[in-house]
Swiss-Prot record:
E.C. code: 3.4.11.-
Organism for this UniProt entry: Homo sapiens
List of residues binding Zn(2+): 415, 419, 438
Protein's name in the database: Aminopeptidase Q
Transmembrane segments: 14-34
UniProt topological domain (Cytoplasmic) ranges: 2-13
Cofactor: how bound: Binds 1 zinc ion per subunit.
A biological process term (GO) from this entry: proteolysis
Gene: LVRN
Homology family: Belongs to the peptidase M1 family.
Post-translational modifications: N-glycosylated.
């Protein structure tokens, strides 16, 4: 062994190997940690998307944008520091729901949008804001999560714990080490140097900035519009469902209710509105010396973030007082001067009073503002105390007297006022139960309007507005349930819940529940529910519990199961049942309603039955309620005899959410009754029989001939809504497009024209002699167009003549307005029966009008020409001349949709496809292929069509187009077989 060295540190070879192993293990661990920390993106505030745009624009004049500073001592005001890297470890920020560590109690919110009347924004404008959020800590944590998106956090402090009973006095401050954003889950994360204490309250103080956009109606947004001949701008908000986080950092979940003190800073020439009445105003100068108005508002009740609302505008208003509370309708100055807001003002107060009396709960806020925006994608929003509408859903102009608009405005206003109880006062706990808001608000639309207009046919209107559409959309296996059991929704999935199932199926559930109980019991349960959960949140089971309490307190209504078991069978299952009654045996069965009555049941769950209330009539007399609470059951009382007067109809007034089928004898008995005395069957059931029969035949439950038999009596039918249902089901777009391929047109013409005389004479006489008589006939207003277009398509001479008369009067004297319900048809046939002279008149009208709706009407009408050269010229104009360059209507698609235009458009595309693609985009070419190819029935036709378009599409587009054309071909082959059967039946019965 050699001598030891005089200096240094030595290890043995074994120790060296051990240390090398430890270093390797450490490096491996670091690699694993790096992979984990890179699990999701971590973004400091300065790198948020969209905020570079903000920095590129002129900074808000109120103060300079602060520059990041080093972490200060606790004695200095904290400026936010950020972690420079974009990684983050796995943690609560990966979850779709906020952790339950903090409960918000109160927000002090100030917003300062830089909107000036002398500098109209070009697409966007900056805003700044401050929010102080008082929270209660429930779990010790040094990481605070709240929602925030599209904002730059400029300052963050946490003060507390707050001393009990001393307001905002604090005993300390919790240093904030870092602020960063989890973009995918839309969180702002505050990293603290020490944990918050459970049971204590704190105040989060945040300053932020962002952008107000014009092109998106989410968060804060802009409308630029024209009023009194000048271009103006306004700012408004839409925070439902998850857009509050776009405006200010917050706890953006519906169950996290809090109170709000709101302050808006705005130009002195504007008025600021929010949920509560104005509390006071003061003046403020920015760094440039410009004066701004500071408007503060009273404290709100406890409410979720999605109901917070702001508007800054230069509007006028009309007002009235209802039970001591002010109601104001705000709109453009022109609209107020024209009286367009008067109708909404006159109905709003009485609707509030009706619902207050019905629920025995007064409206909670001291005022209501309702504002009409020139452009609002959501149509209407129920913000507490500040409801926001699109103009089309609130303003009634003199020219609207012959539209269904008056009734539709009544429904929309009733819906939003209904939300003041269902949604605002009592809010669903989470978005999976949004139907508790929207379904009941939709249902009470009809109850309100029926109360004020008892002569309106309530069942027929509910069918037309709600049932007809939802029953066509809701099919087992391919749709969703009304109430979702899943709670962890992504933001995009939450937005998708605002669909026909939430609104229309939800309303149908409420209506069915009301009918199998009774109105008194139904309202009594709702009163209890609303009172118990006022200013709070509820789940579906809470609602069922209060219904069960009401049922248990009486003995008149006896149910076969608990209300929860009954209603869960409807709200937790997709689709609906088809109920089939054998009138010979009295056997009733249920099965899920499937598209095309699929035979493969392998995807079914064991729970594929409903507890079905059966209200029914026999020989015109209402019978006691029965229940089908299993797959099959015998009801001897529903058997019919051989008597011609013996018949049964299930689903009284269509209050149950299901289709009804009968055995052959049952359908035969109903058909005999229709031919003998149709008025013995109520209008709603004539509607029901037609709609159910055609839907059942389309989906292979019964033969098409069974449905057609029900139309034989139509010569005696004088209810236009029944005719509308027949024509919608029989004269479909597919059938119209096939008239030159199959010999069905001449047969259908002879069959229907023999039966149209009565209904046609009624309404053609009204149109000629007293068209204003239609203004309060809602069912006629929504049905006339289909009657008129079918009569003219069938070549009814008087229809063509009336179209000529109305068109000529309008051309000669434009003040002679064409009745709105048939304006599209009259314009179309005016062009189809005319020459280039009439076409040029429409072009001139199109060029000079600024009304968007009228432009769309005229664009479609000009495509009705039968002259190929006119259609070619039209398409040339569409891609090259100024009248059409700003119009979003795809003129080429419109032309291609017509019988003559299909071939003209195909040839036009050969020479102009690049210009068409540039004007309308590549997707328009794909849409055109489907439009032009909607009659293909062979693979050869598909190949020919694809070869024709091959140079216009990319390879991936060709593959998609081929697959979709195959689907179209299969549909057309099915329609061809159906048309052949219809034609054969018509031959036997014409």
């Amino acid at each position: 062994m050699g001598p030891p060295s005089s200096s240094g540190f030595y290890v043995s070879r074994a120790v060296a190997l051990l240390l090398a192993g430890l270093v390797a293990a450490l490096l491996l661990a670091l690699a694993v940690l790096a992979a984990l920390y890179g699990h999701c993106e971590r973004v400091p505030p300065s790198e948020l998307p969209g905020l570079r745009d903000l920095e590129a624009e002129s900074s808000p004049p109120l103060r300079q944008k602060p520059t990041p500073t080093p972490k200060p001592s606790s004695a200095r005001e904290l400026a936010v520091t950020t972690t420079p890297s974009n990684w983050r470890p796995p943690g609560p920020w990966d979850q779709l729901r906020l952790p339950p560590w903090l409960v918000p109690l109160h927000y002090d919110l100030e917003l300062w949008p830089q909107l000036r009347p002398d500098e109209l924004p070009a697409g966007s404008l900056p805003f700044t804001g401050r929010v102080n959020i008082t929270v209660r800590c429930t779990v010790a944590t040094s990481r605070l999560l709240l929602h925030s998106l599209f904002q730059d956090c400029e300052r963050a402090e946490v003060r507390g714990p707050l001393s009990p009973g001393t307001g905002n006095a604090t005993v300390g401050r919790v240093p904030v080490d870092d602020v960063w954003f989890a973009l995918d889950t839309e969180y702002m994360v505050l990293e603290l140097s020490e944990p918050l204490k459970p049971g204590s309250s704190y105040e989060l103080q945040l300053s932020f900035s962002g952008l107000v956009k014009e092109d998106l109606r989410e968060g804060l947004f802009l409308n630029v519009y024209t009023d009194q001949g000048e271009r103006r701008a306004l700012l408004a908000s839409q925070l439902e469902p998850t857009f509050a986080r776009y405006v200010f950092p917050c706890f953006d979940e519906p169950a996290l209710k809090a109170t709000f003190n709101i302050t808006m800073i705005h130009h002195p020439s504007y008025v600021a509105l929010s949920n509560m009445p104005k509390l006071g105003q003061s003046e403020k100068e920015d760094v440039n010396g410009s004066k701004w108005t500071v408007t503060t508002f009273s404290t709100t009740p406890h409410m979720p973030t999605y109901l917070v609302a702001f508007v800054i505008c230069d509007y006028d208003h009309v007002n009235r007082t209802e039970r001591g509370k002010e109601i104001r309708i705000w709109a453009r100055k022109d609209a107020i001067a024209n009286g367009s807001a008067d109708f909404a003002l006159n109905i709003t107060g009485p609707i509030f009073s009706f619902l207050e009396d019905l629920f025995n709960i007064s409206y909670s806020l001291p005022k209501t503002d309702i504002i009409a925006l020139p452009s609002f994608d959501n149509h209407a929003m129920e913000n507490w105390g500040l409801m926001i509408f699109d103009e089309s859903g609130l303003l009634l102009e003199p020219k609207d007297q012959l539209t269904e608009k008056k009734t539709l405005i009544s429904y929309v206003v009733s819906h939003e006022i209904g939300h003041q109880w269902f949604g605002n006062l009592v809010t669903m706990n989470w978005w999976n139960n949004i139907w508790l808001n929207e379904g009941f608000a939709s249902y009470f639309e009809f109850e309100v309007i029926n109360y004020f207009n008892p002569k309106l046919p309530r069942n027929e209107i509910f069918f037309s507005n709600i049932l007809h559409n939802i029953l066509r959309e809701d099919h087992a296996l391919v749709t969703r349930a009304v109430a979702m059991k899943v709670e962890n929704f992504k933001t995009s999935e939450i937005q998708e819940l605002f669909d026909i199932f939430t609104y229309s199926k939800g309303a149908s559930m409420a209506r069915m529940l009301s009918c199998f109980l009774n109105e008194h019991l139904f309202v009594s349960a709702l009163k209890s529910y609303l009172k118990t959960f006022s200013y709070s949140n509820a789940e579906q089971d809470d609602l069922w519990r209060h219904f069960q309490m009401a049922i248990d307190d009486q003995s008149t209504v006896i149910l076969p199961a608990t209300i929860k078991n009954i209603m869960d069978s409807w709200t937790h299952q997709s689709g609906f049942p088809v109920i089939t009654l054998n009138v010979s045996t009295g056997v009733m069965k249920q099965e899920p309603f499937y598209l095309e009555n699929i035979k493969n049941r392998t995807l079914l769950t064991s729970n594929d039955t409903w507890i079905v209330p059966i209200l029914w009539i026999k020989n015109g007399t209402t019978q006691p309620l029965v229940w089908l609470d299993q797959s099959s059951k015998v009801f001897p009382e529903m058997q019919v005899s051989d008597s011609d007067h013996d018949w049964v109809i299930l689903n009284l007034n269509m209050t149950g959410y299901y289709r009804v089928n009968y055995d052959k004898l049952g359908w035969k008995k109903l058909n005999q009754q229709l031919e003998k005395d149709p008025k013995a069957i109520p209008v709603i059931h004539r509607l029901q029989l037609i709609d159910d029969a055609f839907s059942l035949s389309k989906n292979n439950y019964i033969e098409i001939e069974t449905a057609l038999e029900l139309t034989k009596y139509l010569a005696e039918e004088d209810e236009i809504i029944v005719w509308h249902t027949v024509l919608v089901n029989l004269v479909t777009r597919d059938l119209v497009s096939e008239v030159n391929i199959y010999d069905i047109y001449s047969l259908l013409k002879r069959y229907l024209l023999k039966r149209l005389n009565l209904i046609w004479n009624i309404y053609s006489t009204i149109i000629r002699e007293n068209v204003l008589a239609l203004q309060d006939d809602y069912l006629a207003l929504i049905s006339l167009e289909k009657l008129f277009v079918t009569a003219c398509w069938l070549g009814l001479e008087d229809c063509l003549q009336l179209s000529k008369e109305l068109f000529a009067k309008w051309v000669d004297h434009p003040e002679n307005e064409i009745p709105y319900p048939i304006k599209d048809v009259v314009l179309c046939y005016g062009i189809a029966l005319g020459s280039d002279k009439e076409w040029d008149i429409l072009l001139n009208t199109y060029t000079n009008t600024t009304n968007k709706e009228e432009k769309i009407q005229l664009a479609y009408a000009m495509s009705c020409s039968k002259d190929p050269w006119i259609l070619n010229r039209y398409m040339e104009y569409a891609i090259s001349t100024s009248p059409f360059t700003s119009n979003e209507t795809n003129i080429i698609e419109v032309v291609a949709s017509s019988e003559v235009g299909r071939y003209v458009a195909k040839d036009f595309l050969v020479n102009n496809w690049q210009a068409v693609s540039k004007r309308y985009g590549t997707q328009s070419l794909i849409n055109l292929i489907y439009t032009i190819g909607r009659t293909v029935t062979t693979d050869l036709q598909i190949v020919e069509l694809q070869q024709f378009f091959s140079n216009m599409l990319e390879e991936h587009q060709r593959i998609r187009v081929h697959a979709n054309l195959q689907t179209i071909k299969n549909e057309n082959l099915k329609n061809k077989k159906l048309s052949a059967r219809i034609a054969a039946w018509l031959r036997r019965n014409t």
